[in-house]
Amino acid sequence: DFDPIPTGSTVIQFWRGRLYAAQYFPGSDMTAVWHSQPLGFHLFDLTTDFLAIHGKVLMMAPTDEALVIGTDKEIHAYTGDAIRVLATYGVVPGWCWSRDDDDKSVYIWSQRGLCKAMPFANLTSGHVSVAPGVQAGAAVVAQGGQKRFVVALHAGGTAFNQRT
């Protein structure tokens, strides 16, 4: 017997023939990331088919290698078999990521600047430190033979200035 998508699910993404839906539980500061049956996007087994992730999931971005999951505390990669922490800082709320269809990379506006996945790398640490904003809207824009990652921010947040 299967269940429908859990009520209260917010961030939703398709990856490798399944629907993923994040449901945040503020009392425990945990998110359940539910996944559907293969190609049964409306069928969920709520007893076994989920990942438990610390913090509030704010984004899920599909890549060939992994489903990249960004929370308010960390950035993770879920490969279908295992989940691992990519960064010990989170992402900015809003639409903080965009995909480059040419190289199939995902670009993410994080609490510490611009990151790329997969493989994961922070592209701005060591070069520039900016306030991350409190809300983000992002896109990869191709124009005039060039591509740019553009992010529009609601001002706020604190820049991370790493001590060396």
Region locations from a protein language model:
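Short, solvent-exposed secondary-structure boundary motifs
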Residues: F2-P4, T48-L51, V130
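Solenoidal tandem-repeat scaffolds enriched in leucines and small polar residues
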Residues: I12-D29, S36-Q37
